[in-house]
A protein has these predicted regions:
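Hinge/lid segment of periplasmic solute-binding proteins
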Residues: 16, 20-24, 94-147, 152, ...
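Extracytoplasmic/periplasmic substrate-recognition and gating elements
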Residues: 266-339, 366-369, 386-389
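Short helices/loops that flank or line small-molecule/ion binding pockets
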Residues: 74-88, 103, 154-155, 171-176, ...
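Conserved N-terminal structural module of periplasmic/extracytoplasmic solute-binding proteins
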Residues: 1-96, 395, 399-424
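Beta->alpha turn/N-cap motifs
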Residues: 72, 91-95, 188, 254-262, ...
Length: 424
């Protein structure tokens, strides 16, 4: 008892002098600094897992010290430009690597040793947002995509079948409305791009010369998509887990990671629900159930003091063994709801999924596609959202709105290409 009390007192006193943002520090020239964003795997539990893995595996094997630091989001680029950034940053938002790369803030990884082998660890769609004109500015950390969640018991009691395509989905929405019930569908850019992909329409022409939103087929897609929220009156905001748990929303489309939250926070409906591929679009005799994949990434900063050591860390961190170890430890500490959506394919397959769960996720992932990041592309999702809300909230004409904002997006794309000296 006295030894435990002494430990508590010492820990309390030490807390006044310990820097909890820097877990380990070493002045060696070979040392690398790794930043982790606080909204990614940030948090003391997760950081301790990463540091323990570095201490147990990475440093003894490669003789490279690692200073892991927890930082607030939004500090990466300003710090890098000020010359005080890290060597490596992990859990970086997927829209940032290409934009940082165009500003020479992160390194192109494609020329590093064994790059071609390392990149095979991931689904190629997961790499798409980090590439531009044969340059690769990041390695994927996490990767996720939407799936359809269904309350089997509720659907059965209503005499409804799981919809296989969007026409059937609309029919289900109509029937649910008659019972004062709802279906859930996100209205974000990733969902709209999914609709475009299912109609064989790319978001951009070539490598970002222009956006394809005003292409006639894309205009039609936008028009039909917004009808789900105007004519069918689908909700814009809702608590997915709670509405699904109560049965008020017996069918919804959401990121596959919602599976973990439902299992933890709604154990009373175990065995009464499932998840499967999203509805497909049927054009003639051709069906398409493509979804949009997204995630986070690891980057090497341009001001990196020792690129070889930084690359060694990135290879180790993205490898199957490290990703599986990290995933298992995090889940053991924080529970099933924190299951890590690793982008490493082999590590993902070894997580504690059932055969049916793994089969369903793997099938949907095979239809996942990444949205390319292009100079000026940060305005694409913003202007899409403006167009969507103007139709749904202000009853504006969908054709006019999507064409209007497509022109504004094109103007931004053109401006950024001129700024970076990119020839068409």
């Amino acid at each position: 008892v006295w030894s435990q009390l002494l430990h508590v007192v010492n820990t309390f006193l030490y807390s006044f002098t310990n820097d909890y943002n820097a877990i380990q520090s070493n002045d060696s020239d070979d040392r690398i600094v790794v930043w982790v964003g606080s909204s990614g795997i940030g948090g003391r539990d997760q950081m301790q897992v990463l540091q323990q893995m570095v201490n147990d595996s990475f440093t003894p094997t490669y003789k490279i010290d690692v200073d892991v630091q927890l930082v607030s989001n939004g500090t990466l680029l300003p710090s890098a430009l000020a010359g005080v950034g890290p060597d490596v940053a992990i859990q970086v938002e997927n829209t940032l690597p290409m934009n940082y790369g165009m500003r020479n803030a992160v390194k192109d990884l494609s020329g590093f040793k064994n790059f071609d082998d390392v990149i095979q660890r991931f689904d190629q769609a997961a790499v798409v947002p980090y590439c531009f004109r044969n340059k690769v500015f990041a390695l994927p950390d996490t990767y996720s995509f939407p799936m359809m969640f269904v309350r089997l018991d509720v659907m059965d009691s209503l005499g409804l079948k799981i919809p296989k395509n969007w026409n059937e989905f609309k029919d289900v929405v109509s029937e649910l409305k008659k019972k004062n019930m709802e279906a859930g569908l996100p209205h974000d850019f990733n969902t709209f791009s999914m609709m475009l992909f299912q109609n064989d329409i790319s978001v951009y022409e070539d490598d970002g010369i222009r956006v394809n939103f005003d292409e006639p087929r894309a205009v039609k897609v936008f028009e039909e998509y917004t009808k789900l929220f105007t004519e069918y009156q689908m909700q814009l905001t809702y608590d997915a887990v709670n509405r699904f748990r109560t049965g008020e929303m017996p069918i919804l489309i959401a990121d596959y990671t919602l599976f973990n939250h439902i299992n933890v926070f709604a154990p009373e409906i175990k065995g009464q629900w499932t998840f499967c591929a999203v509805p497909e679009t049927i054009n003639g005799n051709v069906s398409n159930k493509t979804v949009t994949g997204t995630g986070t990434a690891t980057v090497m900063m341009s001001g990196c003091r020792n690129a070889e050591n930084a690359w060694t860390f990135m290879c180790w961190w993205s490898d199957t063994e490290a990703q599986l170890s990290f995933s298992r430890r995090i889940e053991a500490i924080l529970g099933k709801s924190a299951r890590y959506s690793t982008a490493n394919l082999k590590a993902f397959e070894q997580l504690p999924w059932s055969n049916d769960e793994l089969r369903a996720i793997t099938e949907q992932r095979s239809f996942a596609k990444g949205v390319p990041e292009v100079p000026g592309g940060y305005m694409t999702s913003r202007y899409y959202n403006f167009a969507f809300l103007s139709v749904v909230n202000s009853s504006k004409n969908p054709v006019e709105q999507i064409r209007k904002y497509a022109k504004l997006i094109d103007k931004e794309l053109e401006g950024k290409r001129l700024e970076f000296g990119i020839m068409s």
